Amino acid sequence: YLIAVPSFLLKLIEYAKQHDIDLKTSGVKGAICIGEPLRNQDFSLNTLAEKITSQWNIKLFSTYASTEMNTAFNECEKQQGGHHHPELIIAEILDENDQAVPANHVGELTITTLGVEGMPLLRFKTGDMVQAHTEACGCGRNTMRLGPVVGRKKQMIKYKGTTLYPPAMDNILNDFSEVECYIIEISNNNIGTDEICIKIATKTPSDKLLSRIKDHFRAKLRVSPKIEIHDKKVIQKLQFPIMSRKPVMVIDNRKTDS
């Protein structure tokens, strides 16, 4: 088994193709994936995960973790969310008023690390917007499970009356095989509202492709952001700054109140 960022698995697949390496003989049975979501909110594989499994017959497992919590929410073999370890941390899903959200609602994951050593935290706000699942899992465990991260609280975008998180845009862009790579830039316009500019790289640039992508955005999210075509090297330089352990997919240039 590998522990990897999903987008790096795609790079491994690309490398194998370029060097005539048969992945069937690799001996890899699966990957425990970190840093990027694998699933939609209904736990089906998202487009990124489908791209991996369609080219490499391995099983993918999601995990959610952070340095601060000193533990992880890992998927079991049923792959229906990451299991909570109540003996290690107390997990709460809170609204903007620090109150527990109703069942089946999204809120900010807040943790208290009473069961781990070295770094105790009381009601630490992770900044990640998630939904809890409390029904019994098919594996037999009864612990709460975390669904896929909806987005970062600070990356919430109010765009033309619609609330968006970058992962929703990731899923749409990953639907297009023509898009080699991309980066999402968020900024403020001259009246102080949010603007989105998505920079993509493609080997087949055309107005028709841009129109298809925009139509897909309107169908899925009811809005269509600005989309620009750039050289692949320009986008990759933005995606992989020096010392970064995983690709940067969002650049948030919005001004924040001090």
Q: Which stretches of residues belong to each language-model region?
A:
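Active-site glycine/GP-rich loop and adjacent strand/helix microenvironment
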Residues: 1-258
